[in-house]
Amino acid sequence: MLFRSLGTIERQFNGIKVVVDCANGAASYVAPEVLRRAGAEVIAISNEPNGRNINENCGSTHLDNLIAKVRTTGADLGLAHDGDADRVLAVDNEGNVIDGDHILGILADHTDIPTNTVVGTVMTNLGLIRSLESRKLTFVATPVGDRYVLEKMLAEDHMLGEIGRAHV
């Protein structure tokens, strides 16, 4: 499913330099590889898990290292996962933080969504919902919790959803 999803991205990452902070966790091997397969030049940081250093001053809860690396390397984008890789935040080339709602909006703009539906929760940002609707996408709200979003996505074959707090 993970690599199948790469085919839904309208634009490849060719010529884009991406710093990815893997939080010394589950994303340490997968995230850099997915980005490389998508064509990105990848700089991986905090990608050496040893069983004790997960989330240690790195990842989506500690963005300082990512922001610094993006700025010093001239990267176009930075991505930060948490230790279990169920959360991602981004920073732009200047180090400005891009939160989960913005990421979902960007993905909706650049992804073929077969069901034309995005799943979120009753707490999803109203601005995001209005933005999706202006693009003729349907927004479906579930109760708060990744379980409910995932259940809705699986039951109705939706490809894009988020529960907030950068869980996309």
Q: At which residue positions do the language-model features occur?
A:
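Phosphate-binding chemistry for phosphorylated carbohydrates and sugar-nucleotides
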Residues: 3-165
